[in-house]
Amino acid sequence: MNRPLLQNSRLLIALLLVQGIAAGVHGQKPGTLLWKLHHPVASSPAIGTDGTVYIGSFGGWVSTTINKRISNWKRSPPGKSGSSIFALDGKTGKKKWTFDLGGSEGLTPAIGSDGTVYVGPSGKSIFYALDGKTGAKKWEFKWNRGSRNRSMLPAIGGDGTVYIGTGFTVYALDGKTGSNKWEFNLGHQARSTLAIGIDGTVYIGA
């Protein structure tokens, strides 16, 4: 399952290959199903500041809202499928920019508080920070230890530190410069998505 998101006491879950589901958790009867959309989900959901929900699907992107199940728009990526990231207008679905990640497929990005997009391609030993408005590359981080990006999402700490899992190793990167703040060898293959506690503790299963 992809990473769930919690907003305004509502839990949004995108089930891989099945459907997108939002369920109320606090302030309502726990687990109450608000709505569901049937789409071939390929990524974790993301929620804009206006409540728009974005879900990557096999064959394109879908936009809806946290309160309704109505699809605002759908968009199919141009050309052949590959490792690219697309920035689409949240209201119309019009493409703003695209960036070629150079891998077999792109992983779900993380968005910083300043709009910076953090993402890497699956199967490659490289990670990017992109300008959220233009798609221009801010920095890249490479490693040469045989570990490659897997289907694990990057996580951003409260101080802007970006954490990535690369197989056997977790890296903490400066969100502004991409410099390596620290790294930790897990001793085992990472098997879960990174999570950051309110005290800054990093959690990952291996």
What is the predicted function of each stretch?
Residues 2-12:
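Bacterial N-terminal signal peptides that target proteins for export
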Residues 25-206:
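Extracytoplasmic/lumenal domain signature
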Residues 2-3, 18, 67:
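Intrinsically disordered, low-complexity regions
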Residues 12-20:
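Bacterial N-terminal signal peptides
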